[in-house]
Swiss-Prot record:
InterPro entries: Bax_inhibitor_1-related. Belongs to the BI1 family. Signal peptide: none annotated. GO terms for cellular component: plasma membrane. This is Uncharacterized membrane protein VC_1358. GO terms for biological process: regulation of proteolysis. Its main location: membrane. Keywords: Cell membrane, Membrane, Transmembrane, Transmembrane helix. The chain crosses the membrane at residues 25-45, 46-66, 78-98, 105-125, 140-160, 161-181, 199-219. It is a multi-pass membrane protein. One of its GO terms (molecular function) is calcium channel activity. It is found in: Cell membrane.
């Protein structure tokens, strides 16, 4: 039978461990975002082709699925995390150059960055302070993700601007939901590996940014 003192001690230890994971996650996340930004600016300046960007994305996906599962619990996991986020950031070069060349393009990019930051900070702060359990969203989010991927693949051949806007809007909602879900997992002690947590949150932010950029880009073209 657990004594009150033992229960309080265990609760304190869990809280300290959770706070440590949160602190390490957000510190590493900030470093990976800086790495991605530098890589993106470099590939924008170089002017890499979409084919090169695709190769970089495929290499990053390979690291995510085949390297990270083995390295995530070791110090090499940190190295691979920066390689992964560097490749993902660098792959944004052609897309960012495309939007930058549009009328008011730099403003659109800045707006997308600002909105992404506001959404992420707002949702994270709400989840951390409320400690609400968002695990109930899991099935809805993964179903939404599958729908977004399938719809995006179909629209490659259809080429509908309206469909693109709808897909980007749903995608923004889905990845906002994933921010709530993943933050909740850390707060509730379900995610204890800060490298894994960082990668999940990084992908949420990246996809939220690209979704918002698409939405703002389409709206800017219609003005």
């Amino acid at each position: 039978m657990n004594t009150p003192m033992f229960t309080r001690t265990s609760s304190l230890e869990r809280t300290l461990e959770t706070n440590k994971v949160l602190k390490n996650t957000y510190f590493l996340l900030s470093m990976t975002l800086v790495t991605s930004a530098i890589a993106a600016m470099a590939t924008m300046a170089i002017g890499i082709s979409p084919i090169v960007a695709l190769v970089m994305q495929l290499a990053a996906i390979g690291i995510l699925f085949f390297v990270m599962p083995k390295a995530i619990n070791s110090s090499s996991g940190l190295v691979w995390t920066f390689v992964f986020t560097g490749l993902m950031g660098g792959a944004l070069g052609p897309m960012l150059n495309f939007y930058a060349a549009m009328p008011n393009g730099p403003i659109v990019i800045a707006q997308a960055l600002g909105l992404t930051g506001m959404v992420f900070l707002g949702l994270s702060a709400y989840t951390i302070t409320s400690k609400k359990d968002f695990s109930f969203m899991r099935n809805f989010l993964f179903a939404g993700l599958i729908i977004v991927i399938v719809a995006a693949l179909i629209n490659i051949f259809v080429g509908s601007t309206v469909a693109h806007l709808a897909i980007s809007s749903v995608s923004a909602l889905v990845f906002s939901g994933f921010i709530l879900f993943d933050t909740s997992r850390i707060v509730r002690g379900e995610e204890t590996n800060y490298i894994s947590a960082t990668i999940s949150m990084y992908l949420n932010i990246l996809n939220l940014f690209t979704s918002l950029l698409s939405i703002l880009g389409i709206m800017n073209n219609n003005d």
